[in-house]
């Protein structure tokens, strides 16, 4: 009986040791193009769902006005390019991110079934290991709610909000030359 218990303890101790050895060996998938290891997506998704369920605030979507949706569209256009725009090609780092950011203005990408508080939580906190940043230090609380309401109503936006989203992209400002550029040229 001692041999059984000793073998069981040794076997259980070997699992984390072998897992750590696998990760440290350099063979574990770490590049964006690598296939995920078994259970990776399940565990990450389950952790995210549980956290959101516990922390997402409750708010009634009916309380948002068309003006809120237009304001949300302006913020979305500036900050949410990875998730696409209506009738527009995707902007942002799609080919180099894992998982690929969902396109929120395509019928299969709508998050209109998500409560607005869930979208707000994602905007505020970001999503670990996905490339989705936290906007809590960039946007005001009101702006985060406006964006959350916008994506919650993505399939039935007022014309004014759609007009904002369909405007041509604003080109990025040209970079200024370094302060010491003239010294470098001499």
Residue ranges and their predicted role:
Residues 2-70, 74, 92-94, 113-116, ...:
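Periplasmic c-type cytochrome electron-transfer domains
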Residues 53-55, 76-78, 104-106:
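N-terminal start-of-chain detector that recognizes signal peptides
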Residues 60, 65, 85-87, 103-106, ...:
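Short, solvent-exposed coil/turn linker segments
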Residues 67, 73-100, 125-134, 155-160:
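Periplasmic/extracellular electron-transfer cofactor-ligation site
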Residues 96-153, 186:
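Extracytoplasmic electron-transfer domains, predominantly the class I c-type cytochrome c fold
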Residues 159-170:
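Short, flexible loop/turn segments with low-complexity composition
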